From Swiss-Prot:
GO terms for cellular component: membrane. Keywords: Glycosyltransferase, Transferase. Its EC number is 2.4.1.-. This is Putative fucosyltransferase R654.
């Protein structure tokens, strides 16, 4: 990259520092801040839909939409420039900006976005580029962006809303994002004399005047609990998305795409939130099917499968994510049938097995099985749910703790003796999601000694995010065990306290020869040795808990006695045996017994 064009957004409406900018840059375009009085309800709805009222200040809305206008200007330009430097008026431009610009362009290579801003300490000779750090809160102050990245962003915004796009940039490095270190600019907008009006924005409801020949509209009604995909878009865009997928039944005006809709008598009320008349759009060609939905009961489907077993083979469809993440559970189902054939999603089949990650396929005349990973699913129309908690909304619940499924995600050893090493650190805490109880316990234990926060939540250690790592060689679980193996303790906190719900949060520290300080349901202690843990609910108050942790930390013999406890209650514990029992239990469903709940 040899050159770039500069775009300056004049936030406050007056030309602060423009003279110094012009001294350093040629061909700089200036865009004045938008007038919020000229912004239509449609624009605000399209950009900021799916966030609660009053969530954004006027300042935030203006800033984001100003940058959106700059992106549109770039996308629509006919110049031959591929790189653009967008700067906010509310930044200090150092005298050395010309030099830093040249250094930055030389180091940019083929990165799509480079953020700058946040630090006034500038050492040009030490300038370098690194992957974007989401903790940099001033990323909209100034950045280089390619025309290609701009077009990708605009397309993403069209379907997902602008605020979601910004979050995507921050958290997922959308479009190969990098940043310059040291930063080029220091944000000083707090010192401006002209302060934005920081009043809250309330989203105005707009008219719903859309009538489509190929859809039936149900005003203020919805098929609740049966959603698979949410899109932050207006009604015409939602229809466009729904029409691209033949398996899609319809959508509601809140933005939920439907791959299944209940019978009309089971519809629920939908309040007007975005439009003066929110509701449900259903494709006309599916409407008659909806009215006949669920006329075949689960027990009738079981009888049909049973007859197939005695006369021929059973056709089974398995979706891709069930194959990728839960093949051990799929196999537990397949073992039941001596004669079966795996078929594709467009074929006729007797049984479907879906994992709730991708879009699942549901047919009312087949026996539909759902495999879940999270504890809060509220899906009512599957015949069977292999669930991580004791109860589900399906006709039949088969309980299988996620902690054991997570052990199948490992690519490396599950034997704790393979991870014996000196404990050089105190306590680890590795989470992405910021739940209040997690932060509370992190702060509590940190009162005693520093707890290393290895994830995005409360992060205080420079470490690469591995939460999405999932390859043939290793997964995030393997990485967690390697990290934990250096620590005496691990704060092992589930995201929710739900009967039967336990995950890798408990088992990974134990495999790593650390002591988990565990918060979660106690049902799992049927299989896992509670003496090998510090179980938070056993302590009446935080003082007793913290004293217990201190006592173990300072008493080597006590620490060793806990570490030397067996991990499993059953000395012959085996995942293979658990899955064999699971298969036997699922097989009972297709016997003459009427069963609603099965446990391992």
């Amino acid at each position: 990259m040899e050159s770039c064009k500069i775009i300056c957004i004049s936030q406050t409406g007056y030309d602060k520092d423009i003279s110094s900018i012009k001294e350093n840059f040629a061909g700089c375009d200036f865009i004045k801040s938008i007038d919020m009085d000229q912004v239509t309800s449609n624009n605000i709805l399209r950009f900021f839909k799916h966030y609660d009222n009053d969530i954004f200040t006027l300042n935030t809305v203006k800033t984001i939409m100003n940058h959106y206008n700059a992106w549109e200007k770039i996308a629509n330009s006919n110049d031959n420039i591929d790189i653009y430097f967008i700067i906010d008026e509310a930044v200090t431009t150092p005298k050395t900006i010309s030099l830093t610009r040249q250094l930055l362009l030389k180091k940019t290579n083929d990165q799509q976005i480079i953020f700058v801003g946040g630090n006034s300490d500038l050492q040009c000779q030490d300038l370098n580029i690194r992957p974007f750090d989401h903790k940099n809160s001033n990323f909209l102050s100034a950045y280089l962006i390619t025309k290609l990245a701009v077009k990708i962003l605009l397309e993403y915004i069209y379907y997902n809303g602008i605020k979601t796009t910004i979050n995507k940039i921050i958290n997922d490095c959308f479009g190969n994002c990098f940043e310059s270190i040291p930063y080029l600019f220091m944000v000083n907008s707090q010192n401006e004399k002209n302060v934005f009006d920081n009043k809250r924005i309330t989203f105005p409801m707009i008219d719903n005047n859309f009538e489509f020949n190929d859809y039936i509209f149900y005003p203020n009604l919805d098929s609740a609990g049966n959603d698979i995909c949410e899109v932050y878009a207006d009604i015409p865009t939602l229809r466009e998305i729904a029409n691209k997928d033949d398996n899609c039944i319809g959508f509601n005006t809140y933005g939920w795409i439907k791959f299944f809709v209940t019978k009309e008598e089971r519809f629920t009320m939908l309040k007007n939130k975005y439009y003066r008349c929110d509701g449900l759009y259903v494709k006309k060609r599916h409407d008659q099917l909806i009215k006949k939905r669920n006329t075949i009961m689960t027990q009738d489907k079981i009888k049909i499968v049973r007859e197939k077993l005695s006369n021929s083979f059973v056709k089974i469809f398995v979706n891709n994510d069930a194959k990728k993440y839960s093949w051990h559970l799929v196999e537990a189902v397949l073992k039941i049938f001596p004669n079966y054939k795996l078929v594709g999603p467009t074929d006729n089949y007797d049984i479907s097995i879906n994992h709730l990650v991708e879009q699942f396929i549901f047919r009312p005349d087949s026996f539909n099985i759902l495999i879940t990973g999270e504890p809060t699913m509220n899906i009512t129309y599957f015949d069977m749910c292999i669930d991580t908690k004791y109860t589900s909304q399906s006709s039949i619940t088969v309980y299988y703790p996620f902690i054991f499924s997570s052990m199948r995600e490992h690519r490396k050893s599950l034997n704790h003796t393979d991870y014996i090493k000196p404990k050089t650190k105190f306590c680890a805490y590795m989470y992405n999601m910021r739940y209040p109880h997690r932060i509370w316990y992190f702060n509590l234990v940190s009162k005693y000694r520093q707890v290393d926060a290895l994830g995005k939540c409360c992060n205080n250690v420079d470490i690469k995010d591995s939460r999405s790592h999932f390859t043939e060689e290793s997964t995030y679980n393997d990485i967690a065990i390697e990290l934990y193996s250096e620590y005496k303790f691990v704060l092992a906190l589930e995201n929710i306290f739900w009967p039967g719900y336990s995950t890798e949060k408990l088992i990974n520290p134990m495999i790593a020869n650390s002591i988990p300080i565990y918060w979660g349901d106690s049902t799992i202690f049927k299989h896992i040795n509670k003496k090998r843990t510090i179980y938070i609910p056993d302590f009446p108050n935080e003082t007793d808990l913290l004293e217990h942790i201190k006592n173990i930390d300072t008493n080597d013999e006590l620490y060793k006695s806990i570490i030397n406890e067996p991990i499993y209650i059953n000395p012959d514990f085996s995942l293979d045996k658990l899955e064999e029992n699971l298969s036997i239990n699922i097989g009972k469903v297709f016997s003459d017994q009427e069963i609603q709940t099965l446990y391992i």
